[in-house]
């Protein structure tokens, strides 16, 4: 008989994710580490564009195999905390579920929890990976999502314009002492301190699988002309009504200013409560798409740069880039 776990939040298409309580019995705890079994060396993974609708790019895909099954189309999600796949893909991977959880976001949705013996993303191979299984689709046009934090044993260079994910080993003195100690946590969301419109301070989620950016109702305020009539937001766990913000929203992060084309005002109180901090917004894929993100989960830092700045040295030889923003990993 399945055991029910604490509610989980998954940030996928403005859905929040995360597992907070351990499961009884022999199953590893929610923060158990997946084992990296491929050599600890540089990798360059090719990403493919994800178009759930013909004219709207909403993320990037990695191709992966779970337990040696058929290749799966997995959306790379910096807001997810573990792999989530739909019913159709489940039949080909042979995972047995030992517990249940709730994926909660705009609504809630039950999921079964199992463990994959192997997960292969090109030449990169892991074992003992936590997987959430849901009935129906996770996202139309894909088999599921894969968390960016799965690769957190490496320094990550996520080049969205070039559609490449670079995995860079840390220096030897920082290299794990033995293969058995190499692992990646699967509960890390990218939360960065930000100032919105020059006055509202808080934390912002960087979510490569969100189809648009969002701000809290508190930040959006209620002046007439700033919010358009309500629009329905569909997501994996349900739907909600948000308001399209008609005025520009400026996100300032570590000296870098990002101005998304589309921003929706939503109730982000659940996200704030479950992250344990004041979340004022979400930067989705369309806003992040022009940039290169360099992410160190180990040092809790992220750098957001335009491709041009990557090759522009300062006069004194230093790299011409904004300072990295500290990550509040939750």
Regions found by a protein language model. Give the residues of each.
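Bacterial N-terminal signal peptides that target proteins for export
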Residues: 1-9
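Pepsin/retropepsin-fold aspartyl endopeptidases
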Residues: 12-13, 18-330
